[in-house]
From Swiss-Prot:
It comes from Saccharophagus degradans (strain 2-40 / ATCC 43961 / DSM 17024). Signal peptide: none annotated. Pathway: Quinol/quinone metabolism; menaquinone biosynthesis; menaquinol from 1,4-dihydroxy-2-naphthoate: step 2/2; Cofactor biosynthesis; ubiquinone biosynthesis. InterPro entries: SAM-dependent_MTases_sf (IPR029063), UbiE/COQ5_MeTrFase (IPR004033), UbiE/COQ5_MeTrFase_CS (IPR023576). This is Ubiquinone/menaquinone biosynthesis C-methyltransferase UbiE. The gene is ubiE. Coiled coil: none annotated.
Length: 249
């Protein structure tokens, strides 16, 4: 296979057409235990990262928000309260299992009326141009086959002046933190995945996918190249996670 026909599934090179199927398999496998694993593997810190994303979103009453790779609905739940009855949140996820878990979780918690659930591929968003005031994608971009295509698709469906926020694991800024993080990711995380979700391989893929994801400056450059303005990023927890933001001109 030529490089044009291949992409990375973790550290493994696979056919471009095969990556989506294999990523889907990962999330079908972990969907039921996804929230528990998030809390365990981050010590609950993921809630702080997501709250910071909400605070920087600029979302207010009446806005229309797209939560891509929204999964089990943490961001959607908070945005639903902010936009109120005159606004709308679209929870989009390419994975049916994750979408079903998210829908059930939000309905059980009383979130209804202003939330729409859509199975959608971030590379080919099924929405008209200039639809959303804000788009978020949290811990999802690294799983997308063509990240440039996805970023361009997000730009298209944002309204002028709308904001994109990408929350993602990335490259730690301190060598000691990076070394400790590598040990945790490759030794501890798969073991926890096996114990809690009976699936070590999916969490091994998670660790590998993080290492293969573009670093902070590279992702910022990709957003610039797509046409976003005022791009910047905020490192959190020593650069283990970064929040990238950009505005559609």
């Amino acid at each position: 296979m030529s490089d044009e026909q291949t992409t990375h599934f973790g550290y493994e090179k696979v056919d471009v057409k095969d990556k989506a199927r294999r990523v889907a398999g990962v999330f079908h496998s972990v969907a039921a235990k996804y929230d528990i694993m998030n809390d365990v593997m981050s010590g609950g810190i993921h809630r702080i990262w997501k709250q910071f994303t909400i605070e920087l979103s600029g979302v207010r009453s009446g806005h229309k928000v797209l939560d891509i790779a929204g999964g089990t609905g943490d961001l959607t739940k908070k945005f639903s309260r902010i936009v109120g009855p005159t606004g709308q949140v679209v929870l989009a996820d390419i994975n049916e299992s994750m979408l079903n878990v998210g829908r059930d979780k939000l309905i059980d918690s009383g979130v209804a009326g202003n939330v729409v659930y859509t199975q959608a591929d971030a590379q080919y968003l099924p929405f008209p141009d200039n639809t959303f005031d804000c788009i978020t994608i949290a811990f999802g971009l690294r799983n997308v086959t063509d990240k440039d295509l996805a970023i361009a698709s997000m730009l298209r469906v944002l309204k002028p002046g709308g904001r994109l926020l990408i929350l993602e694991f990335t490259k730690p800024q301190n060598a000691l933190v990076e070394k400790a993080y590598d040990f945790y990711s490759f030794k501890i995380l798969p073991t926890m995945g096996q114990i809690i979700a009976q699936d070590a391989d999916s969490y091994r893929y998670l660790a590998e996918s993080i290492r293969m994801h573009p670093d902070q400056e590279t992702l910022k450059g990709m957003m610039d190249a797509a046409g976003f303005a005022q791009t910047k990023y905020h490192n959190m927890t020593g650069g283990i996670v970064a929040l990238h933001t950009g505005i559609k001109p």
